[in-house]
Amino acid sequence: MTANEFRELVRTVSNWGRWNDGGRRGALNHLTQARTAAALRLACTGETVSLSQPLRTEAGLDMPEPADHYMTMLTDVDVGSGSVRFAKDYVGADYHNEGHSHIDAFSHVAFDGLFYDGKPEGSVTAKGADAGDIEVLRNGLVGRAVLLDVPRARGVRWVEPGEHIFREDLEAAERAQGVRAGPGDILLIRTGHARRLSELEPWDTREAKAGLHPTTALFLAEREIAVLGSDTNNDTAPSTTEGVAFPIHVLAIYAMGIHLLDYLQFEDVVPRCEAAGRWEFLFFAAPLRIIRGTGSPLNPIAIF
């Protein structure tokens, strides 16, 4: 895609000024209270399944910046509580990096000096984000999730790194699974990334990964998707968009005000969907209340 074609696409799908809310919620406006209430009916058995990767603390080709985890207190420390002893630990992560399950806030991606809805690039400083922070989701993210399994629809084990997923793939997955993504939905796209990592040797995922083609932004806009997630960071690597390394991040976050869920894992939930004969479920996630944060680590839960 040429630079001019990309900028025209950005203009076409832009939601700037659409809801007259100062750019606070963006496409979350599609996820109304009524739609959240309707999604609760998808919880029938009470079974829950994590959609998160484990928080990894060891480096690898696919995990260049692992989380820090160390003990700050062991039970051999007498804290003056008699026979009661405590263990404590510290956890820290640069969670926007490869392999960490997380959510991106609007303040995570700037393009041409601006964030979503025209907020200036300078609104994010060393102290954090003055606008577009993750606090907008302090009450949680609850709604109907639709999982589209692209490798399943293609009849392959996974989408190869570097390959694009197109609108036609999403529509084919809908037909194969008997489901349709619609207004206010949390759309989840499985590429099979985690399966490939588990069955083959790890590789530098910064250099090659499967993801959405930029033109799928038209699908997201037409269906009025509220949140988008994938088992990669949603973008294809390497990018084939002239001058733009992360076109889906720009289109979704910067242009459309769609929060992104990166590096989820769907290998546990796919068998449950197959057994139930449905690819929709109640989705729940509670981002950390990081004041002025550009996102949050995340452990989303599918509820059946």
Where in this protein do the model-derived segments appear?
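Active-/binding-site microenvironments in catalytic and ligand-binding cores
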Residues: M1-F304
